[in-house]
Amino acid sequence: MISKPDKNKLRLKRHRRVRGKISGTAERPRLSVFRSNTNIYAQLIDDVAGVTLASASTLDKSVSKDATKVEQAQAVGKAIAEAGKAKGITEVVFDRGGYIYHGRVKALADAARENGLEF
């Protein structure tokens, strides 16, 4: 019988490999993205101090539940960019979390760029 590779295990493997190479600082935090089946989450993380500086997700009240998943991801990207600007953050290191740069992850990244984050 042919064994099918577990997609989440492969994603976690990619994520660990990338995390070994990138790290966020207070001046240039890591924009970490996590995608579940129903929601998407974004955090600005200072890896040196080990703290989350700002976060946004589809669970926030500002994000419409009636919108499509891609539209919700765009709203989260806008929200995380605004939260970062409020804390004086303009440059980040993008961590796609092992996900393919497509769909909801790309929509979040593009919206964050349009609203003032540079990466």
Curated annotation (Swiss-Prot):
CDD domains: Ribosomal_L18_L5e (cd00432). One of its GO terms (biological process) is translation. SUPFAM superfamilies: Translational machinery components. Keywords: Ribonucleoprotein, Ribosomal protein, RNA-binding, rRNA-binding. It holds the Pfam family Ribosomal_L18p. One of its GO terms (cellular component) is cytosolic large ribosomal subunit. GO terms for molecular function: 5S rRNA binding; structural constituent of ribosome. Belongs to the universal ribosomal protein uL18 family. This is one of the proteins that bind and probably mediate the attachment of the 5S RNA into the large ribosomal subunit, where it forms part of the central protuberance. NCBIfam families: L18_bact. Part of the 50S ribosomal subunit; part of the 5S rRNA/L5/L18/L25 subcomplex. Contacts the 5S and 23S rRNAs. This is Large ribosomal subunit protein uL18. It comes from Lactobacillus delbrueckii subsp. bulgaricus (strain ATCC 11842 / DSM 20081 / BCRC 10696 / JCM 1002 / NBRC 13953 / NCIMB 11778 / NCTC 12712 / WDCM 00102 / Lb 14). The gene is rplR.
